[in-house]
Amino acid sequence: MAASVFYSRLLAAATLRSHRPRTALPAAAQVLGSSGLFNNHGVQIQHQQQRNLSLHEYLSMELLQEAGVSIPKGHVAKSPDEAYAIAKKLGSKDVVIKAQVLAGGRGKGTFESGLKGGVKIVFSPEEAKAVSSQMIGKKLFTKQTGEKGRICNQVLVCERRYPRREYYFAITMERSFQGPVLIGSSHGGVNIEDVAAETPEAIVKEPIDIVEGIKKEQAVRLAQKMGFPASIVDSAAENMIKLYDPFLKYDATMVEINPMVEDSDGAVLCMDAKINFDSNSAYRQKKIFDLQDWTQEDERDKDAAKADLNYIGLDGNIGCLVNGAGLAMATMDIIKLHGGTPANFLDVGGGATVHQVTEAFKLITSDKKVLSILVNIFGGIMRCDVIAQGIVMAVKDLEIKIPIVVRLQGTRVDDAKALIADSGLKILACDDLDEAAKMVVKLSEIVTLAKQAQVDVKFQLPI
């Protein structure tokens, strides 16, 4: 496949499915966004199939601890009683309770229990229990979760530290550097995207030689540029070098620390961690991928992963089934050009089977907002007749009652057209992509107008 989806996904400004700005694009990625890796849908394109697995903060912190990185003391609690016990064991006069949800903006979020904020400072084990009881088992709503929120199944209970200064640090993959790059800033504990937009000179970058790794002098140079005091530059550099270990060892695409701090004792600590992992490495990173929390994902994401499909739900009403991420985004663009709104991004890849095509239709039609479907296939490796078989099977098995416009070109296209013609189904064929897009937009508009007028309109298939 020439390209595919990078799963951390879409900017909140994009027409993202309401419950999931799917974690908006990682901050490190947005800092490097000027390299042209993002299209206007907010989807990042790679030269190979790549999806990112994100882990909860407490799991990421455990990986850092294994690497010898300095972090605050803390443990995960899955019940209020466990939170009480951990807070008591820490023996600190004040501790921090951090909701574990895979979404940004938790500090300003609201729980369905009414609790404001997903990060709370408490001053006794009893208060830790009371606060965690309002988090665990409750949904947290943030700008990134949308109206459906995200369930909080556990909280991280950790000691409170008092930072003198806060910094931002990340290691991420960057095409323009042809490998990993270190990113640092003296502006930590804030949205690094805002820093990149308002004061880009405050962000420093250091490319890493993928063969030699991080050199000590390189890490020291970055720490100095970030503004660490001379007395702790070496300590900061050591932590940076140690952070590269899990990045390399676990096939990470990003390790982000925000903030990395100098605390009141003069120690360098990583107070928070976000790590993304390349899903192409799942076959050799079973330990990591077994940690995936599917309760944080939409059911359609889980179904798509099982069928090895690249799917992202959006807010529109025109379903899209396409092979290849580049063609999929071009399809969304042309739908938008003609006044329509895509309901999804769905790339079936270059080697899709009849089963995968059927599963793709199940994903599309499970979204009740979808009023019409555009299938756009250019058969190179992908055979058009396989797609046609899947379409016919899906329409029959799923009893699809909404209009389907199919544009097929390439390998075995004549066989595909014959299969569709012989099926007896009212599947609208179109050779020209522009005409196909116009047609599917018009059909969605007809259904939309009918619904607004409270007129019951059904497309009966077969006719």
Swiss-Prot record:
Residues 1-53 form a transit peptide. One of its GO terms (molecular function) is succinate-CoA ligase (ADP-forming) activity. One of its GO terms (biological process) is tricarboxylic acid cycle. This is Succinate--CoA ligase [ADP-forming] subunit beta, mitochondrial. InterPro entries: ATP-grasp, ATP-grasp_succ-CoA_synth-type, ATP_grasp_subdomain_1, Succ-CoA_synthase_bsu_CS, SUCC_ACL_C, Succ_CoA_betaA_euk, Succ_CoA_ligase-like_bsu, Succinyl-CoA_synth-like. It catalyses: succinate + ATP + CoA = succinyl-CoA + ADP + phosphate. One of its GO terms (cellular component) is mitochondrion. Its main location: mitochondrion. Its cofactor is Mg(2+). Disulfide bonds: none annotated. ATP binds at K98, G105, R106, G107. Its EC number is 6.2.1.5. The modification Phosphoserine is found at S279. Heterodimer of an alpha and a beta subunit. The beta subunit determines specificity for ATP. Interacts with ALAS2. ATP-specific succinyl-CoA synthetase functions in the citric acid cycle (TCA), coupling the hydrolysis of succinyl-CoA to the synthesis of ATP and thus represents the only step of substrate-level phosphorylation in the TCA. The beta subunit provides nucleotide specificity of the enzyme and binds the substrate succinate, while the binding sites for coenzyme A and phosphate are found in the alpha subunit. It is found in: Mitochondrion. The record marks D94, Y162 as: Important for substrate specificity. The modification Phosphothreonine is found at T341.
